[in-house]
Curated annotation (Swiss-Prot):
Name this protein carries in UniProt: Disintegrin tzabcanin
Note: The disintegrin belongs to the medium disintegrin subfamily.
Subcellular location per the Swiss-Prot or TrEMBL entry: Secreted
Cellular-component GO terms for this entry: extracellular region; plasma membrane
Tissue specificity as recorded in UniProt: Expressed by the venom gland.
Extent of motif Cell attachment site: 49-51
Domain Disintegrin per the UniProt entry, residue ranges: 1-71
GO BP annotations, alphabetical order: cell adhesion
Role, per record: Inhibits fibrinogen interaction with platelets. Acts by binding to alpha-IIb/beta-3 (ITGA2B/ITGB3) on the platelet surface and inhibits aggregation induced by ADP, thrombin, platelet-activating factor and collagen. Inhibits cell adhesion to vitronectin, probably by blocking its receptor integrin alpha-V/beta-3 (ITGAV/ITGB3), and to fibronectin in vitro. Shows little to no cytotoxicity in vitro.
Length: 71
């Protein structure tokens, strides 16, 4: 299966021919991906809205998880 979006050969993290991450790359895109690496745990990737807390990167994924408010 695809590891990354192989639509653009300009993406330095993704091999456009194979749709696989290039050697050494952890990710190709996402709010918690920077220069082919996961952003460190605790970095804010989405600011708080209303009563919800800031969403923070996990350090293990390129996706920005949604933190849910618990009353």
């Amino acid at each position: 299966g695809e590891e990354c979006d192989c639509g653009s050969p300009a993406n330095p993290c993704c091999d456009a021919a194979t749709c696989k991450l290039r050697p050494g790359a952890q990710c190709a895109d996402g709010l918690c991906c920077d220069q082919c690496r996961f952003i460190k745990k605790g970095t804010i990737c989405r600011r708080a809205r209303g009563d919800n807390p800031d969403d923070r990167c996990t350090g293990q994924s390129a996706d920005c998880p949604r933190n849910h408010f618990h009353a």
